[in-house]
């Protein structure tokens, strides 16, 4: 009696998962200070409109998981989308703003902390950088959070609400690019989406969009942080 012919093992197609990295909206910051990880900085009225625009844009998508930095401006950005999707926001310390020795300082034309000789000792290594949390550490914590969000929303979509530099460094890491960069050239404006598409656990595509792009003031597009309500001379 002949042996039965072996049957081919069916191939399982990896599930597609989208993780959207969402930057927070405009911050009420009339003194134009670098707020960093400081408490007490909330969305401005315009920032709230930006957050609602994101909720209107993504509200009908297959989003099953929302993660946010613990800082107020990020929680407030996440809230309208969470309400639209009927989800709770999971707070994750790993997607918090990067640490920076210049927190509380101003960088506008009227008063720029970088012009003080006492600040120059922090500027010796822009590749690390010497003034704040190392890029490698930012990338490591953000990437870990990104993959955890992917697992939590496997086969669906997740949103990770974070900050400009952590999102930009994550993108550079995923694209295999060096971390050293000109902050004015980051493609990560207010309430923008950097979307990472996974097949299984493999990154297959990265796209960028600005659902609230028409609401963003021209001066805010190239700024390293938001200063809603600040006079022109105090804008970063």
Language-model features and meaning:
Residues 2-17, 90-91, 97-109, 151, ...:
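Acidic, low-complexity terminal tails and accessory targeting/binding regions
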Residues 6-7, 11-14, 53-119:
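Phosphate-coordination/substrate-recognition cap region in phosphate-metabolizing enzymes
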Residues 18-24:
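Short, hydrophobic/glycine-enriched beta-strand segments
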Residues 19, 156-164:
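Generic beta-sheet signal
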Residues 26-76, 81, 131-143:
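Loop-to-helix element that buttresses phosphate recognition and phosphoryl-transfer chemistry
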Residues 73, 166-167:
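Alpha-helix capping/helix-boundary segments
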Residues 116-137, 230-235:
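Short glycine/proline- and acidic residue-enriched helix-loop micro-motifs
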